[in-house]
Structure formats: structure tokens, C-alpha cells
């Protein structure tokens, strides 16, 4: 038991005013880097969705689009592997953007190309706030998506 003395009383009063962790106040906010990673997961889900819908609408494009879709599925797996699910926050599992597929196969390819270009820009925008290993992953995915833009441009030119 502490005895009240000139040195222990101020210490006791100071310590009793300290707050501990707010255990019951809910989960802590999600860190910005984790938010970026979750946005990257959602972006890949959106690209996968538009590829699947385009291939369902224009089956003649399957052979050209299937390899690009497979790369996006690999990107998604690599991104998800980096997610440590934060308390109170679920890892995205469904597309959030579901645009209508263009009315012709050439227009659908152009729509995919534009989506890929937007994805490149978004991935590059994530670099500044990312850890070195995440920045490397984002840059790798952006590079892959840039090659998709070129491949889709070539396919559009042949249409």
C-alpha cells in the first residue's frame, strides 16, 4: 500500500488522470497505406468485372482478352496477399463500378483500353504514399496494365 507522502501523492494524482486505451470505443481508424491497398484491390475487382462482362458479351474476343484477364486475377491475388484485414473493415470482394458494356466489340475494346489507362494512372498515384515493397508491387502492376493498353490498341487497330 502506498503511503501518502509529499512525493507519492502528486505522482498518484498524475497517474490517475491518465487515460488507458479506449477498448470499447470501436476499432482504430484504418491507416492510409491500408486504405490505398484496399482501393487497389477494389480497382482490380472492377477491371476483372469489366473483362468478364466484355467477354460474355463478345465471345469472339475471348482469345485476346483471356490472357489479360488472367494477369488481373494474378494482380488481385498479389494485392490480397498483402492485406491484413483491419478490425471492423472487410477486404473488398465485389466490383463497385459496373459500367454498361459498349455496343460494339471495337467500342468495348476501347472501353477496356480506357479502363486500363485509368488503372495505370491510379497505380502510379499510389506510389508516393506506399512503403517500398508496396510501391514496387504498384509499379509492377502499373507496368503490366500499360502493356495491356498497348495490346488493346493493337487489337483495336485490327478491328
Could you say what each language-model-derived stretch is?
Residues 2-159:
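All-alpha RGS (Regulator of G-protein Signaling) helical domain and cognate RGS-like helical scaffolds
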